[in-house]
């Protein structure tokens, strides 16, 4: 039941809407790991890494919520930070599908854009497709020869059954083994472009931690080849969202979290709804020089877009962050965005938001 009109998870127009939130001293985006539970055991999964939450505790050891406590907790965080966009991740968020059936309509009524990221291991209710401002993204990492091994039991067969009569985004994390066979990338894009359930396809490159050595990691040559070849695929398959501007941003990612617009504009909570994921959604010590995050890449491109004369989005964001920090200090808000305070620490589990710097 796909509409045939590709819709990214967050558009440039929605980013401009976030400007007012920043000026008011609020963080425009939230990411919440709404459960510690997941039936998958994916190689390289950052969420369950020992350093994901700074080394003191792991996601699987946190006390998470369910029922009314989870519903109230998620909605409470959104009200607290007055965010425009929220990503609900995990763990496997569909483990809490009963709570999501209450959370998602409530977020929509609050005017919040929601991206729900799931493996597709649990059926997605078709009635959710009628919820305004909701997008559901299914993580499909390669063709069955790789995906069904990496992400079992969320196999292709199971995903296709569980997204029937739905309208979803397909999120694809590209790893090095997928580049070993000629034609692999186009075969993937062609398959999902032909599925009526797929509204659009967006990709990330595998992002390693500093010092990591794994089979999933892309080499500099791999990244250059992807930046060259993927825009050509997107030109032939309109559902695949990857234009030359994104290719340039992918090839030259932000140097560090302080240079990353996505890291600046997002506060990230783990499953206890208190612990913070720092310095970005990956947690731990991500190797920014090899970042492949779709959100980071997209916003890294957006920051260079000209909006008035010679001024770019980045000029407005930098000035807005400084103004928002001042407004937050004047109001002495308990939930002020401490990432906007240069002297604040970048990791912590208290009530202060992640540190945002321009």
Predicted regions and their residues:
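Short loop/turn motifs at secondary-structure junctions
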Residues: 41, 82-83, 132, 196-199
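Secreted/processed peptides and extracellular or luminal domains of membrane proteins
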Residues: 44, 48-51, 266, 286, ...
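Processing junctions and N-termini across compartments
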Residues: 32, 36-39, 254, 282-285
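Short cysteine clusters
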Residues: 38, 42-45, 260, 280, ...
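Alpha-helix termination/capping residues and helix-transition junctions
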Residues: 80, 130, 194-195, 285
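Conserved alpha-helical substructure of the radical SAM core
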Residues: 2-127, 315, 319-320
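Flexible mid-to-C-terminal extensions adjoining Fe-S/redox cofactors in radical SAM and related proteins
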Residues: 26-28, 272-358
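Radical SAM enzyme [4Fe-4S]-AdoMet core and its adjacent flexible, acidic
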Residues: 57-58, 110, 134-267, 272, ...
């Amino acid at each position: 039941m796909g509409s045939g009109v590709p819709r990214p998870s967050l558009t440039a127009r929605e980013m401009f809407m976030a400007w007012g939130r920043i000026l008011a001293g609020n963080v425009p985006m939230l990411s919440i790991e709404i459960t510690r539970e997941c039936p998958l055991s994916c190689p390289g999964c950052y969420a369950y890494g020992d350093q994901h939450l700074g080394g003191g505790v792991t996601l699987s050891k946190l006390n998470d919520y369910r029922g009314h406590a989870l519903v109230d907790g998620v909605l409470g965080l959104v009200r607290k930070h007055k965010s425009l966009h929220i990503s609900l991740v995990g763990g496997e968020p569909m483990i809490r599908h009963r709570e999501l059936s209450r959370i998602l309509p409530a977020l929509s009524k609050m005017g919040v854009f929601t991206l729900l990221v799931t493996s597709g291991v649990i059926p997605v209710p078709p009635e959710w497709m009628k919820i305004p401002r909701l997008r559901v993204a299914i993580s499909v990492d390669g063709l069955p020869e790789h995906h069904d091994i990496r992400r079992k039991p969320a196999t292709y067969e199971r995903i296709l059954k569980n997204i029937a009569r739905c309208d979803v985004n397909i999120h694809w994390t590209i790893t090095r083994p997928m580049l070993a066979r000629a034609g692999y990338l186009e075969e993937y894009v062609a398959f999902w472009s032909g599925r009526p359930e797929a509204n659009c396809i967006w990709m990330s490159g595998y992002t390693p931690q500093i010092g990591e050595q794994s089979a999933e990691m892309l080499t500099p040559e791999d990244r250059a080849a992807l930046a060259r070849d993927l825009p050509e695929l997107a030109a032939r398959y309109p559902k695949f969202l990857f234009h030359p501007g994104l290719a340039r941003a992918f090839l030259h990612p932000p140097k560090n979290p302080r240079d990353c617009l996505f890291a600046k504009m997002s506060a990230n909570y783990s499953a206890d709804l208190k612990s913070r994921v720092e310095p970005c959604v990956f947690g731990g010590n991500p190797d920014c020089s090899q970042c492949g995050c779709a959100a980071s890449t997209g916003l890294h491109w957006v920051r260079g877009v000209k909006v008035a004369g010679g001024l770019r989005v980045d000029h407005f964001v930098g000035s807005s962050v400084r103004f928002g920090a001042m407004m937050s200090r004047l109001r002495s808000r308990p939930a002020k965005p401490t990432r906007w305070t240069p002297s604040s620490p970048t990791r912590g589990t208290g009530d202060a938001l992640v540190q945002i710097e321009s």
